Amino acid sequence: HQQVVLGNAYLQDFFFPGYTAEFVAAWNKDDPSVHYDDNGFLVRPAPIGNVVNEGPGGGPLAHGIRVGYFGWLGSGHIRRVNLTHAFYQAVGEDTFNPVAGRRVTVNAQMAAAELSYDRDWIRYRISTFYTSGDANPRDGRARGFDSIVDLPNFAGGIFSFWNREAIRLLGSGVSLTTDGSLIPSLRSTKEEGQANFVNPGIFLANVGADFDITPKLKGFANVNYLRFERTEPLEFLLFESPIRHSIGEDFGIGVTYRPPLSENIVMTGGASALQPGAGFKDIYTARTLFSLFGSVKFTF
């Protein structure tokens, strides 16, 4: 179904010593197809909006992606301040976007940056994350950014409720967010579904800290403020207006423990919570959502 071509170029000591720049070009060609997951649910095309052609011949409508990504990423340090950043521009087309109900051209952006400072055994972090959103879900321009596939260790990573928990969109066959992603992409699944560039986008601000308690034990604390960049796609799909922009505050704590001081055994545990903002309350609930989790990974 899908073919991806990726090219990277790295430049060390770019601009200043200790900073490495990475320039990325990627091409995502995801052909139209019909696919059901192991539980028998339709995931390609995404079961939302216009899916079936009701004209002569019938059948699912062709939803194909032809999108190029161009990115500038970097990591390094300026004296004692650590810097990590990324910017992506996505351009191309979707042959038939189910939300827009038509062919759309893609023009979307993503930006992220993190500054951190090490003091003794603690690293203090501030970061921000942004993806553009679509202000008019039915026109011919798709401005909501979506990735090919992502698993960001950013803004709390797996210790963030928003990042870890897949949140289903009410009354639909898609998710507001998929597990392991910060982007409210409105796609069926990250692994089996297709990218969707008609989505609300997001703005995130983060503060946190990492604690090297012992060489084997590391702790994490994290607070995020989340906000939809646009809400028009949600208002259109849910037949509800207005939906406000604030998603809420996301709190997370956790630890990782490596008994043999290697990656052979990694034990992870934590707790996270999402305190809904006005926009999340408009869609779901005003109750605080909680998550407790733990895992053990063996690598040999």
Regions found by a protein language model. Name each.
Residues 1-142, 203-207, 212-213, 225-229, ...:
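Signature for the C-terminal beta-barrel architecture of outer-membrane proteins
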Residues 51-58, 95-98, 185-193, 235-240, ...:
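Extracytoplasmic loops and strand-loop junctions of Gram-negative outer membrane beta-barrel proteins
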Residues 144-194, 198:
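Flexible glycine-rich, low-complexity coil/linker segments exposed to the extracellular/periplasmic environment
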Residues 179-235, 246, 251-253, 282:
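Exposed, low-structure sequence patches enriched in small/polar residues
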Residues 246-276:
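C-terminal structured "cap/appendage" subdomains that terminate the fold
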Residues 253, 287-300:
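Outer-membrane beta-barrel "beta-signal"
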Residues 261, 281-286:
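Short proline/glycine-enriched turn/loop segments at secondary-structure junctions
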